[in-house]
């Protein structure tokens, strides 16, 4: 409507919409091949994770869904651990990375294990960031989702290269 009001050519509008690739780190496809899918998302709250995981499972109902989540902030992890555990259990397999502290100092007793212990699922683990690529390489990850507001996105290039070789 605004474009029409501003008298922008309709062909230019259609071309711009067709070329729009979405927002970075919101259900962003990093790898999309027949055998492997890697999606990255900034989700760092249980409701964002719920939308992400439900959407992915709806799009790919026949693929095993593995989520790699990096909790963001000790206070958020402490306050929302139950919600994170409930929502992460939507995935078939859960990998937690250590908490990204951002501006916070550690809080005694608050860690990714706090969430892990509340997840009602056997296929779950905590890995260090340095272990993730090798773990993915040695496991069958059909639909891999990385999520978090920390620095988890720094692993994407290595994950992408490894998955592309794995085809």
Enumerate the language-model features and the residues they cover.
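Nucleotide phosphate-binding/pyrophosphate-handling subdomain across enzymes
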Residues: 1-93
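A structural signal for short coil/turn segments at secondary-structure junctions
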Residues: 24, 60, 119, 139-140, ...
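Short glycine-rich anion-binding loops that position phosphate/pyrophosphate groups of nucleotides
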Residues: 44, 71-73, 100-102, 149-152
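Short hydrophobic segments within beta-strands
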Residues: 68, 97, 146-147
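Short glycine-/acidic-enriched loop or helix-start segments at secondary-structure transitions
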Residues: 78, 105-106, 154-158
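C-terminal helical cap/extension that packs against the catalytic core
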Residues: 85-142
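A short, gly/pro- and small-residue-rich
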Residues: 111-119, 157-167
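A glycine-rich beta-strand to alpha-helix segment
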Residues: 131-162
């Amino acid at each position: 409507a605004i474009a029409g009001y501003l008298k922008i050519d309709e062909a230019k509008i259609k071309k711009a919409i067709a070329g729009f690739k979405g927002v970075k780190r919101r259900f962003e496809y990093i790898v999309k091949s027949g055998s492997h899918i890697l999606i990255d998302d900034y989700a760092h709250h249980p409701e964002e994770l719920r939308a992400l995981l439900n959407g992915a499972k709806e799009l790919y109902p026949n693929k095993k869904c593995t989520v790699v989540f990096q909790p963001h902030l000790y206070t958020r992890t402490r306050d929302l651990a139950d919600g994170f555990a409930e929502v992460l259990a939507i995935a078939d397999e859960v990998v937690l990375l250590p908490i990204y502290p951002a501006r916070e100092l550690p809080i005694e007793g608050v860690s990714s294990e706090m969430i892990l212990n509340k997840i009602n699922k056997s296929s779950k683990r905590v890995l260090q960031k340095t272990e993730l690529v090798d773990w993915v390489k040695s496991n069958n990850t059909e639909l891999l989702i990385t999520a978090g507001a920390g620095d988890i996105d720094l692993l994407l290039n290595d994950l992408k290269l490894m998955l592309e070789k794995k085809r």
